[in-house]
Amino acid sequence: MKTNIKLWTMGLMTAALLGNTACTDLLHDSYGQVVSEDYVPKTEEDVSYLVNAAYIPWRETLLQWNGVVRAQELCADQDVLPARDGIGWVDGYIYKRWHQHTWTTEDDGVLQGWERTYNGVNTCNRILSQIEEGVISVDGETKEKLIAELKVLRASYYYILIDLYGNVPIVTDFKDTSLPQQSTRKEVFDFIVKEITENMDLLSETPRGYYYGRFNKWAAHTLLAKMYLNAEVWSGTAQWQKCIDECDIVINYAEKSGEYALENNQKDVFVTHNENSKEIIFALPFDEIYVTGWNDFDFHMYTLAPENQDTYQLTARPWGGVCAVPQFINSFDEDDARLEDNYIQGQQYTYSGEILKRSIDGKPLIYTVDVPSIDQSDVDDGFRWGKFEYATGITNRLSNDWPLLRYADVLMMKAESLMRLGKSGAGALVTQVRERAFKNEPEKAQVTDAELMGGSVYDYGRRDSYKTEHDGGTDIKYGRFLDELSWEFCQEGRRRQDMIRFGIFTTKAWFSHDKSDETKNLYPIPNK
């Protein structure tokens, strides 16, 4: 995305905002500086530059090295980062520990989700403090709306923290330097819900323009729906009807205004220039030129084999790591377009159409579904991530915007809540999402309420070169619905959360992962 990138680069508050420091490089922590007393936002554009400084940590916590996407995906049943012959990816066995649920408080993946997300909380608190003290001179309705947006944004960072760590400290006072006390998970849940509900009606209803990549009213309702969707796990009390109510608010607005809708092709949500997608409710804007952190959105770098540099004419050579768990790939219907659209597979070619060959032995580079184990794999074992478009000639960073909240999720959240309440209508909503994936076989898009309540088609059980088990998934309550979530939302940094909600994250085995214990439903709070 390029047309709106100024929302992020200018969000750093460069010379106009920083007292003694000015920098346009997003590698800098310039959003951590105190805003100059001379700065007075006068226009809607000025306000957008101010508030967007607080959104930058979302990108970092989600997608930078060992960020939240990995913390949600590499521990779950869809993706694995195995050791690669001739390439590496052993890295002190951090990815093996992720896969096998044996992580420690010292692991980088445990630490980064904590530090980067609290950086987002602290940035919100800093700007709120400056507004409340008059350092940033904002008056009247503009001040009220700005404070509301920052509080909802802060709540979104706590949405990550409650999911990953549970009973975390609630920090709202930027100037309080005392050691914060942990809150219970329910207290954190109630805080997040309160912050969203008390402030969302003050947010803009505008989905684009200066509000693209920011929380508007509809994004807040969607975030609140996700809180209610996970309420039973996070607070101890299910709130399915409240989830439905929040989804209905967004659905009714979408149908009335036409601002939000499913794309005709799922792939269109994830193309390089996806900033105009009506399916995206809340996006994290990216641009390979202006977003300059080395590991900002580098899916192509850590999934493609090094030889694929010649396929996409990349400016840097990929590292050939993450791939799909074979059991997950085998769960797809062969006519489901999402299997081909979301995974790079089969014979690989150069940009000019010649057969791409393996550097190690000159044989054709062919991505196969099978992977021997977490401990050993060849350069072309496993299907590769390909949901996001890899544009020709890109650098080590993608320019696709990240669809953090999208309309398909609203439909699926409502469907799941209806199903769990024993109400009708889930099948029709899921069918609506499936139809674009089965255009050539429309009858296969149809799914009923009863089918969604059945078991999973995923054949669980340890399945690698060390052991072969076939435990299946027919015993999973609402397992078919869980399958639907996996097929629609793969590679989007949410699988762990879904598996926990359906009660199988620690009770099932897959690939090189054995069953673990319920303590692994949360990451430990880091020691550092």
Can you say where each PLM-predicted feature lies in the sequence?
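Conserved, well-structured interaction surfaces
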Residues: 39, 44-52, 56-62, 87-165, ...
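Bacterial Sec-dependent N-terminal signal peptides
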Residues: 1-32
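Flexible, polar/acidic helix-loop-strand segments at domain edges
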Residues: 90, 94-101, 329-407
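Short coil/turn linking the two alpha-helices of tandem helical-hairpin repeats
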Residues: 160-164, 169, 230-236, 422
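An aromatic- and glycine-enriched ligand-binding surface/loop that stacks and positions planar moieties
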Residues: 24-90, 197-198, 214-365, 507-512
